[in-house]
Swiss-Prot record:
One of the record's GO cellular component terms: cytosol
Keywords: Riboflavin biosynthesis, Transferase
Species name: Geobacter sp. (strain M21)
Entry's family note: Belongs to the DMRL synthase family.
Protein name: 6,7-dimethyl-8-ribityllumazine synthase
Pathway(s) the chain acts in: Cofactor biosynthesis; riboflavin biosynthesis; riboflavin from 2-hydroxy-3-oxobutyl phosphate and 5-amino-6-(D-ribitylamino)uracil: step 1/2
Length: 155
């Protein structure tokens, strides 16, 4: 009979780090509210949550790698918004941020959730930060709660 491992949605006893980009802060703050709501609803102790604000999305991956490598966190949540403008800047930033966040997780073995919105318009970002399309910060927190518990089961 195989052993099945499936993460529980229980944040009790886990330590979380949240990195939020300040650029497009109206969106980032809504994503942060969603992430904190999910963590606290699922039993996280707010004293075990560290929120780090960085200038923008581009600074998120390095901060995530530093935090993940510290050994102080069971999981991290990366939040922010990159909104397309009239130059190719969006393409460069969104690509490097997504690669960097994935690298931080793979290099350290710490679950790191990608809650950085990459949208064409401010309206799309607002929809994903707590209106029509839910709150992607909440969703990112739910993901890391589950994966952190999967990793605990695998030890």
């Amino acid at each position: 009979m195989p052993k099945y491992v499936e993460g529980k949605l229980n944040a009790e006893g886990l330590k979380f780090g949240i990195i939020v980009g300040r650029f497009n802060s109206f969106i980032g703050e809504r994503l942060l509210e969603g992430a904190l709501d999910a963590l606290l609803r699922h039993g996280a102790d707010d004293a075990q949550i560290t929120v780090v604000r960085v200038p923008g999305a581009f600074e998120i991956p390095l901060t995530a790698q530093k935090m993940a490598g510290s050994g102080n966190y069971d999981a991290l949540i990366c939040l922010g918004a990159v909104i397309r403008g009239s130059t190719p800047h969006f393409d460069y930033v969104s690509s490097e941020v997504s690669k960097g966040i994935a690298h931080a997780s793979l290099a350290t073995g710490v679950p790191v959730a990608f809650g950085v919105l990459t949208t064409d318009t401010i309206e799309q970002a607002i929809e994903r930060a707590g209106t029509k399309a839910g709150n992607k910060g909440f969703d990112a927190a739910m993901t890391v709660i589950e994966i952190a518990n999967v990793f605990k089961e695998m030890k």
